[in-house]
């Protein structure tokens, strides 16, 4: 296959920029891709909106849709770098089989844009990562051809809440687990600070407070009654942030953080157990989260220990681009 062929769309196909009006059609595309790769949908409309409106993402410059000759959306690519740091994430979704001709053209577009984003954000070189489920061989081949190399795996964890009591077990002595007070600005800042500090020694960056609040404001609903803090001697030392629409049957742990000095005391498990109880009380039938299998805090061991299993794993790939002015 020639280089020209890999980045040329079929006759009658085109690319265009997305708008928020496209969210339902984009979600349909992502669900089709998910079902082909892992057997079930694993994305919600709020996540599509979030990816289109994230800090440092401009739909009119950073995102593309591929549209076939009938006008159907068959591909979507976008970046993800909410912190503005020196690492980005390139996502490319295509409709199973039918949308494959859009894969390399979309990847070429987003990678070309990555060089410009590097210059705009002031980073050179600029690290770019991407992901693929091991069964997504066409995507893996395209990433490899584009210079990406395998880095590690992430796992999508899940657990049934059947039989989980809405009353959580007591936390360890000296630890208090309670709901967050979302109307208390000082507590919201402390909550964010715990997450930011706890993730500092991992491979995952957290956006600053303003960007984080901006992300929350863009969600259709924020379920603060499913957010938790852990206190020791009156100090917030652990935080659990949940996400996902209330009508979903899965409670989602988007962030679980415990300050380094308070780890190995059962605080992370206490937060998880309380979250599972809250989810069960709210009628959810399962709990889920994502984890970096190379996380130095050994988070995967905690999740396996409380009964979660890997629904699927995704390979993470990495390359670097040189900054280039637009």
Regions found by a protein language model. Give the residues of each.
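Acyl-donor-binding surface of acyltransferase catalytic domains
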Residues: 1-7, 81-174, 315-319
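Conserved hydrophobic beta-strand within the GNAT/NAT acetyltransferase core sheet
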Residues: 128-130, 253, 287-291
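C-terminal "cap" of GNAT-fold acetyltransferases
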Residues: 156-178, 285-297, 309-326
């Amino acid at each position: 296959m020639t280089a020209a062929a890999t980045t040329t769309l079929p006759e009658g196909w085109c690319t265009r920029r997305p708008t928020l009006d496209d969210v339902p059609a984009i979600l349909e595309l992502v669900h089709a891709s998910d079902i082909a790769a892992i057997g079930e949908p694993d994305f919600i409309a709020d996540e599509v909106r979030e990816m289109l409106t994230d800090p440092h993402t401009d739909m009119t410059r950073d995102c593309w849709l591929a549209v076939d000759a009938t006008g159907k959306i068959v591909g979507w690519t976008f970046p993800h770098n909410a912190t503005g740091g020196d690492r980005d994430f390139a996502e490319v979704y295509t409709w199973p089989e039918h949308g494959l001709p859009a894969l390399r053209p979309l990847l070429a577009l987003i990678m070309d844009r990555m060089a410009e984003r590097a210059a705009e954000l002031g980073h050179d070189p600029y690290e770019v990562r991407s992901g693929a489920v091991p069964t997504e061989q066409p995507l893996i081949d395209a990433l490899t051809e584009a210079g990406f190399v395998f880095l590690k795996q992430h796992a999508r964890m899940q657990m049934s809440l059947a039989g989980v009591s809405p009353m959580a077990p007591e936390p360890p002595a000296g630890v208090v687990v309670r709901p967050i007070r979302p109307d208390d600005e000082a507590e919201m800042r402390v909550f964010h600070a715990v997450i930011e500090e706890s993730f500092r020694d991992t491979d995952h960056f957290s956006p600053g407070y303003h960007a984080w609040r901006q992300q929350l404001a863009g969600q259709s609903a924020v379920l603060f009654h499913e957010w938790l803090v852990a206190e020791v001697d009156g100090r917030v030392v652990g935080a659990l942030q949940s996400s996902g629409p209330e009508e979903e049957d899965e409670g989602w742990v988007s962030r679980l953080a415990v300050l380094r000095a308070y780890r190995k005391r059962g605080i992370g498990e206490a937060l998880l157990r309380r979250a599972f109880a809250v989810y069960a009380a709210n009628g959810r039938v399962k709990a889920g989260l994502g984890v970096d299998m190379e996380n130095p805090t050994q988070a995967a061991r905690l999740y396996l220990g409380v009964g979660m299993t890997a629904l699927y794993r995704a390979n993470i790939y990495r390359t670097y681009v040189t900054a280039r002015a637009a």
